[in-house]
């Protein structure tokens, strides 16, 4: 795994040796950023954006955002073994980029209450077969975590069911191998 573009282009991102963690593949990540850059369905300018990386794992998505000029990235991960690799990956950047790491269970009742607001981009990469995603989307909406024109991107297995929540719209959907990438926004 590597950083694809921007300030840290070409740098490697370490990943865990076990197979329980499935970091975002470079090709899928590159496709996501191409859509973010060129889509006519929404406008996101990564430069100076504020990004929330939920289930961040080793930080591949959030680090790519920092490399491409994001103003701030908040990484949220709950598993200690993966968290150690995330910290190492960020330290290896030797950068004064603005980022924060939060070790917390996202399903904690107070997680979204205590989180910053107005994220331009929220990335979700939950474990496959995760069935509590409605809690996350409701937390984001009820606590106004996403900015008015913000986008939520979710990485899922291609065979997983769509998430249907009133007021949540799928803007774009792409399949890459076994991965499904969904782009969401809340209806205004």
Stretch-by-stretch model annotation:
Residues 1-188:
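Class I S-adenosyl-L-methionine-dependent methyltransferase catalytic core
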């Amino acid at each position: 795994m590597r950083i694809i573009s921007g300030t840290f282009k070409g740098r490697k991102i370490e990943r865990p040796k076990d197979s329980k963690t499935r970091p975002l593949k470079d090709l899928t990540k590159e496709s996501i950023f191409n859509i973010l850059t060129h889509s006519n369905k929404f406008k996101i300018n990564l430069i100076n954006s504020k990004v929330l990386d939920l289930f961040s794992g080793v930080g591949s998505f959030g680090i790519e955002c920092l490399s491409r000029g994001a103003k701030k990235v908040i990484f949220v991960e709950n598993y200690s073994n993966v968290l150690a690799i995330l910290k190492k990956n960020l330290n290896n950047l030797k950068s004064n980029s603005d980022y924060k790491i939060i070790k917390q269970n996202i399903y904690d009742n107070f997680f979204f209450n205590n989180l910053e607001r107005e994220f331009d981009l929220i990335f979700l990469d939950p474990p496959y077969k995760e069935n509590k995603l409605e809690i996350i989307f409701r937390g984001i909406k009820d606590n106004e975590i996403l900015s008015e024109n913000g986008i939520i991107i979710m990485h899922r297995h291609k065979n997983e069911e769509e998430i249907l929540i009133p007021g949540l719209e799928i803007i774009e959907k792409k399949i890459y191998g076994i991965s499904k990438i969904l782009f969401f926004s809340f209806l205004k």
